[in-house]
C-alpha cells in the first residue's frame, strides 16, 4: 500500500470511528443489524433498509436529530441511503464495516 493510500485509509478509519463513537449513532448501527425488527414497510427492509421514521420512533428523537445522526454515518460510508418517494431508507454498508473490522487489529 502506498503512503498516500495509507493516509487515505487512516483518514477513513478515523472518520468511521468518530461516526460510531456516539451512543445514539452506535445504537442506530446496532439496530440496523436486524432491519426486520422494525415495523413492516412497503419495501422489504432487508433490501432497501429501514425508513428514517422507524429509526426516529425507536430512538424517540426528532426527525432532524435522527437525520443528523444518519448523515454522519453516511458521510463515513457506514450506511447507504435509498430514497423511495419522499422516504429515506438506511441500511448498513457491510463491506465498509468488514473493512473497518479488518483494519482495526492492524492499528490496535
Question: Where are the predicted features?
Answer:
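N-terminal leader segment of winged-helix/HTH proteins
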Residues: 1-26, 75-78
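Short, hydrophobic-biased segments on the C-terminal half of alpha helices
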Residues: 32, 70-71
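Short, charged/polar, Gly/Pro-enriched secondary-structure boundary elements
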Residues: 96-100
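N-terminal helix-turn-helix DNA-binding core of bacterial DNA-binding proteins
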Residues: 12, 18-62, 88-95
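Residues in the helix-turn-helix
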Residues: 65
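Beta-hairpin "wing" of winged helix-turn-helix
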Residues: 74-84, 91
Amino acid at each position: 500500500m502506498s503512503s498516500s493510500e495509507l493516509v487515505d485509509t487512516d483518514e477513513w478509519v478515523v472518520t468511521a470511528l468518530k461516526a460510531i463513537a456516539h451512543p445514539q449513532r452506535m445504537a442506530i448501527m446496532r439496530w440496523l443489524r436486524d432491519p426486520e425488527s422494525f415495523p413492516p414497510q412497503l419495501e422489504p427492509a432487508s433490501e432497501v433498509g429501514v425508513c428514517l421514521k422507524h429509526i426516529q420512533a425507536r430512538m424517540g428523537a426528532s426527525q432532524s436529530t435522527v437525520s443528523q445522526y444518519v448523515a454522519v454515518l453516511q458521510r463515513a460510508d457506514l450506511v447507504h441511503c435509498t430514497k423511495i418517494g419522499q422516504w429515506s431508507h438506511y441500511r448498513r454498508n457491510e463491506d465498509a464495516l468488514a473493512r473497518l473490522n479488518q483494519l482495526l487489529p492492524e492499528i490496535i
